[in-house]
């Protein structure tokens, strides 16, 4: 059906309306036309309007969290937002229409200073206070409604094709009453006189206008660069505006800025609309309104592009294809504008889906920015202090990456022409303008904060290494099948490694004998390879089971192989069925230890980890005196090794017994030869060296021993080399006694050396002996009784 929104010069067709609200969504019949002629400024309630915005801001954060947590219901929720999109379509369409230039100076007076955005400078005023006509800005729809007098019709004469963006919450739908739109000539003198007469009435609504047009960031800087032509000025302002909007999209997922004055494709190149400045954006940023939500830290990065910006007008009208954001998508300053026939927009290309996909996709302005920006923000704003929210979100993001990459393969061909329209000169100029604008936007406080963050991040990277080189294992094991298929070299280089400095590592490396060999083995030279290349190896004998890491060939061609380590050990141990490994990282690539070592290359992006729970690789605690018991491939090998150990033990015991017997034979021989002297009653503090030195005067001593007892009866044995020396010591040994010592007891060994105290001193303790216990019944009888007893026994 045809939908007449303006006059007879521009008519919207079914295809254009379907492109705005969705391919499968019909236009709502309850919004046929709007009649704004009877709208009075006094009927507007600014307090309730601002309160509604605050309520929407509070609800937007909750809904955005729901979208982030429930990505599976994205398409169902997008369909519910289409009704709210109609109001955005009407607002954006009506705002794009030109009005007379006489009413613009009053808006500049109202919005001077407080309302000006950070990326736009207020138009320079003439001496009489009026701005140049080509620099004039058009008021938005709400401005027109607030500033229009009672019973006055607003004038429109043009409308243009638009590309809509979803900016309404699906829980609070906006409904409008049916009305009739009445048009009149926009350049009539009647409209000019009305606008000039109503200037005093615009002042009471200045606070509302400031509230609607002021961005979050304070307008503390203004661009000072003067441009040679209005064409260059228009392009640079659009670029700066796009950059400021990208900051809001980066920090707040629910924020959206709509250009209120998209240029008409029917305007000729020499029309006065070509030289006019871009209209200030009506920031429908419910979550970004100052004072409504807590501030976001750290400062937003200003160097990231906005994938939802409108293309500026550089050439005659042509069709524009808006691809969804993805890792391969590159956005440049397109020369085409929105034509009459806009391409239809599927539900997967809405802003909400794009925002969710943006967190898991990579996009870079290679032609504009000459740099890549990672959009897979796994660590929040600080890469070194925050960890991954949950393992489920990682899996969701990875699956969305693969889904987006498959969809873009068929759509990149249609958008190649858009990337080639901007020449290198324009790109360099845009890049310089964007860089200068971004440098002016940073406030002194935020600059100091960014400097501190960079210093802290540099120190941490210097000590621990870059976060992209850290090890992420748990999600890698679960998602290795997803990465094995659709990752090319470009995608692999853009994909940052999952850093999990504080994440628990369940899948561990196993030990291996040939780990150094596996580290030097090159990868296969295919273009598409898996993120985690599995190449396990298990040794055959006397070696635990290990898995190896195979860095890519390109890494070793660029720099020599260097293995770095992090001094981080984990004290998690396994049960007895598996060895109690302590996880550590080794300094040497070829070092082998009983711990599981996590190796990684300095510039490598690939990590490999598999866990093998094999009975042959199970380690048990050993009872042997060795550090660990070796492993065997077969029972026969185990039996053979056990017999060898038993044989060695028997041989050792046999040798020890032979040595003991030999010493005993030598002692007995020395005793028989009268070469061993027993020395008794020595001091308890006498040492073997002292006793040897004192008795060595009689001859050469082969052996000297001292035995100390608790009761003080200490003694020693001295073995001489010759028998004559032993006899000399036995005869003259008493002369060695000192004045404070008792006389030595000197004997030849063999008589008292094996005596014990209970044997030698049986009668020393007479109290312990009871003679009554040894008496029999006959001891208590007299002689007569004994005689009678004897005779009685004989009679038997």
From Swiss-Prot:
Pfam families: RRM_1. The modification N6-acetyllysine is found at residues 77, 144, 182, 252, 269, 276, 319, 345, 411, 449, 756, 777. It comes from Sus scrofa. This is Peroxisome proliferator-activated receptor gamma coactivator 1-alpha. Phosphorylation by AMPK in skeletal muscle increases activation of its own promoter. Phosphorylated by CLK2. Homooligomer. Interacts with MYBBP1A; inhibits MYBBP1A transcriptional activation. Interacts with PRDM16, LPIN1 and PML. Interacts (via LXXLL motif) with RORA and RORC (via AF-2 motif); activates RORA and RORC transcriptional activation. Interacts with LRPPRC. Interacts with FOXO1. Interacts with NR5A2. Keywords: Acetylation, Activator, Biological rhythms, Nucleus, Phosphoprotein, RNA-binding, Transcription, Transcription regulation, Ubl conjugation. One of its GO terms (cellular component) is PML body. Residues 98-138, 211-274, 288-349, 463-487, 541-637, 648-667 are annotated as: Disordered. Its main location: nucleus. One of its GO terms (molecular function) is chromatin DNA binding.
């Amino acid at each position: 059906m045809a939908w007449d929104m303006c006059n007879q010069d521009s008519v919207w067709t079914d295809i254009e309306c379907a492109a705005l609200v969705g391919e499968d969504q019909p236009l709502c019949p309850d919004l046929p036309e709007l009649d704004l002629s009877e709208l009075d400024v006094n009927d507007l309630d600014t307090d309730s309007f601002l309160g509604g915005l605050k309520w929407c801001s509070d609800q937007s954060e909750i809904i955005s969290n729901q979208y982030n947590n429930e990505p599976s219901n994205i398409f169902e929720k997008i369909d519910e937002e289409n009704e709210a999109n109609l109001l955005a379509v009407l607002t954006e369409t009506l705002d794009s229409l030109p009005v007379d230039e006489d009413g613009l100076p009053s808006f500049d007076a109202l919005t001077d200073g407080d309302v000006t955005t950070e990326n736009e400078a207020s138009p320079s005023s003439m001496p009489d206070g009026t701005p140049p006509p080509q620099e004039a800005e058009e008021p938005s729809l709400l401005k027109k409604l607030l500033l229009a007098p009672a019973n006055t019709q607003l004038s429109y004469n043009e409308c243009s094709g638009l590309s809509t963006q979803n900016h309404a919450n699906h829980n609070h739908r906006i409904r409008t009453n049916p009305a009739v739109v009445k048009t009149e000539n926009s350049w009539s003198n009647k409209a000019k006189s009305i606008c000039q007469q109503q200037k005093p009435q615009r002042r009471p609504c200045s606070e509302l206008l400031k509230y609607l047009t002021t961005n979050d960031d304070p307008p503390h800087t203004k661009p000072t660069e003067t441009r040679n032509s209005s064409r260059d000025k228009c392009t640079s302002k659009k670029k700066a505006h796009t950059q400021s909007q990208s900051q809001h999209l980066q920090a707040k997922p629910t924020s959206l800025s709509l250009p209120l004055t998209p240029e008409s494709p029917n305007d000729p190149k020499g029309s006065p609309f070509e030289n006019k400045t871009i209209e200030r954006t009506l920031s429908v940023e419910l979550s970004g309104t100052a004072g409504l939500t807590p501030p976001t830290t750290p400062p937003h990065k200003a160097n990231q592009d906005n994938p939802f910006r409108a293309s500026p007008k550089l050439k005659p009208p042509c069709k524009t294809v808006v691809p969804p954001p993805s890792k391969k998508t590159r956005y440049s300053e397109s020369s085409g504008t929105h034509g009459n026939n806009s391409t239809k927009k599927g539900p997967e290309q809405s802003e909400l889906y794009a925002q969710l996909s943006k967190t898991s996709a990579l996009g870079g302005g290679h032609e504009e920015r000459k740099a890549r920006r990672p959009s897979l923000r796994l660590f929040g704003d600080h890469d070194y202090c925050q960890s991954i929210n949950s393992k489920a979100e990682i899996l969701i993001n990875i699956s969305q990456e693969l889904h987006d990459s498959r969809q873009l393969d068929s759509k990149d061909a249609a958008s190649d022409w858009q990337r080639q329209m901007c020449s290198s000169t324009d790109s360099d100029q845009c890049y310089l303008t964007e860089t200068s604008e971004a440098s002016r936007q940073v406030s002194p406080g935020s600059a100091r904060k960014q400097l501190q963050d960079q210093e802290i991040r540099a120190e941490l990277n210097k000590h621990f290494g870059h976060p992209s080189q850290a090890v992420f294992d748990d999600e890698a094991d679960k998602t290795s099948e997803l990465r094995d298929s659709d990752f090319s070299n470009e995608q692999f280089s853009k994909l940052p490694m999952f850093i999990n400095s504080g994440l628990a590592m369940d899948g561990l490396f196993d030990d291996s004998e040939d780990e150094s060999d596996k580290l030097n083995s090159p990868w296969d030279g295919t273009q598409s390879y898996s993120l985690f290349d599995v190449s396990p190896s298990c040794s055959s004998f006397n070696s635990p089971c290990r898995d190896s890491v195979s860095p890519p060939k390109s890494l070793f061609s660029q720099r020599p192989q260097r293995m770095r380590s992090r001094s981080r050990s984990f004290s998690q141990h396994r049960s007895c069925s598996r060895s109690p490994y302590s996880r550590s990282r080794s300094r040497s690539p070829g070092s082998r230890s009983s711990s599981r070592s996590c190796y990684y290359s300095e510039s490598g992006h690939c990590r490999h980890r598999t866990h093998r729970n094999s009975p042959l690789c199970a380690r048990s605690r050993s009872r042997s005196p060795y550090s660990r018991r070796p492993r065997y491939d077969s029972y026969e090998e185990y039996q053979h090794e056990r017999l060898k150990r038993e044989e060695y033990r028997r041989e050792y015991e046999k040798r020890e017994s032979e040595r003991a017997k030999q010493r005993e034979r030598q002692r007995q021989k020395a005793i028989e030869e009268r070469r061993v002297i027993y020395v008794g009653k020595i001091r308890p503090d006498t040492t073997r060296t002292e006793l040897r030195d004192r008795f060595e005067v009689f001859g050469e001593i082969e052996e000297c021993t001292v035995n100390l007892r608790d009761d003080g009866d200490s003694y020693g044995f001295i073995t001489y080399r010759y028998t004559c020396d032993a006899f000399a010591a036995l005869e003259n040994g008493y002369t060695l006694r000192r004045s404070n010592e008792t006389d030595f007891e000197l004997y030849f060994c063999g008589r008292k050396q094996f005596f014990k105290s209970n044997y030698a001193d049986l009668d020393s303790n007479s109290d312990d002996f009871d003679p009554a216990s040894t008496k029999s019944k006959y001891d208590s009888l007299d002689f007569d009784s004994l005689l009678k007893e004897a005779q009685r026994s004989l009679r038997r």
